[in-house]
């Protein structure tokens, strides 16, 4: 079967002139193309649609197709728009994933430093430092497995540390081996309030807020790591505690961006812009939204993205605690 692009004009071709390029479509794709055509996608039988399906599975496209079918641009659903939406989602995830990494790095540094200073390098093996025995046992099992896996892969520093400590991994090394999920479990279960409050204060929040936000960031991170569909979900993977002073819905997928900007904001007056992570993220996300406003601005509300005139939420989340306080009319007090 040959589908000729000359059968129609691409919506991106402003001249209206058809292309002479033809695509040979494998028979195994006929059923999918016919199914999409039956669902009302105007460009379903075009060669570009089969080309896309050879590079992105139908299952992966489904959430984007469903969103475009429910809310077609210009009144007509197109596979091309689903592809554009998927690309927009991937770009958002790539930006968010980068800042998840920065948040993770600070979380690891803060927790390991405070636990080591207060309780020594082998503190994670001390049952008395944790609130719930069962949770500690599960966390320690995960931690030990992750450290041993790193040693088996040939990391000499981890191998040496295990040998010197009877098979136990000091937290200053082990913290870099553990998953964010394991770190989240350990932090939430840590009994020493000086440690947990100190870590939370470094992010400008309370222990209960940080424990909640850690779960949400971890769940979102797992989606980003595999480029699963994200912004087109009906709600965020796990609903976090709301950020005080931020009016956006904490159930919508986009809330993860506000959460990360809030966590990475800072009270301190820093001259080095490369360290102003929240403002950098705000700039990147704002740029992405502005570039795609013409295509998908009408869907932003579905995703929980503030309207252009309501983006103060993003500025407040990203601007740092001092900036937020100034915006509230009290320059001498941070939140």
Where do the language-model regions lie?
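Extended intrinsically disordered or low-complexity regions, especially N/C-terminal cytosolic tails and loops
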Residues: 1-219, 231-335
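Acidic/aromatic/glycine-rich contiguous surface patches that form carbohydrate-binding/processing clefts
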Residues: 227
């Amino acid at each position: 079967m040959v589908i000729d692009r000359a059968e129609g004009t691409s919506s991106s071709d402003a001249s209206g002139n058809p292309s002479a390029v033809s695509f040979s479509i494998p028979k195994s794709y006929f059923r999918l193309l016919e199914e999409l055509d039956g669902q009302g996608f105007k460009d379903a039988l075009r060669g570009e649609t089969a080309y896309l399906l050879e590079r992105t599975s139908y299952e992966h496209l489904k959430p984007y197709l469903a969103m475009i079918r429910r809310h077609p641009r210009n009144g007509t659903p197109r596979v091309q728009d689903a592809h554009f939406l998927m690309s927009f989602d991937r770009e958002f995830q790539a930006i968010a994933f980068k800042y998840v990494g920065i948040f993770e790095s600070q979380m690891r540094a803060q927790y390991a430093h405070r636990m080591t200073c207060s309780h020594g390098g082998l503190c994670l093996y001390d049952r008395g430092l944790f609130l719930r025995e069962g949770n500690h046992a599960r966390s320690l099992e995960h931690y030990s497995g992750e450290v041993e896996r790193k040693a088996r892969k040939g990391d000499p520093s981890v191998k040496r540390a295990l040998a010197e400590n009877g098979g136990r991994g000091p937290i200053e090394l082990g913290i870099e081996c553990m998953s964010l999920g394991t770190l989240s479990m350990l932090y939430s279960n840590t009994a020493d309030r000086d440690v947990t409050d100190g870590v939370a204060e470094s992010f400008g929040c309370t222990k209960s807020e940080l424990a909640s936000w850690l779960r949400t960031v971890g769940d979102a991170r797992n989606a980003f790591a595999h480029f699963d569909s994200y912004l087109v979900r009906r709600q965020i993977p796990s609903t976090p505690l709301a950020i005080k002073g931020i009016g956006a819905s904490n159930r919508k997928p986009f809330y993860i961006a506000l959460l990360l900007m809030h966590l990475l904001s800072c009270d301190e007056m820093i001259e080095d812009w490369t360290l102003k992570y929240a403002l950098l993220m705000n700039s990147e996300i704002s740029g992405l939204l502005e570039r795609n406003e013409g295509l998908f601005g009408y869907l932003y509300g579905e995703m929980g993205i503030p309207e252009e005139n309501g983006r103060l939420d993003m500025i407040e989340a990203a601007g740092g605690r001092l900036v937020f306080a100034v915006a509230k009319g009290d320059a001498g007090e941070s939140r």
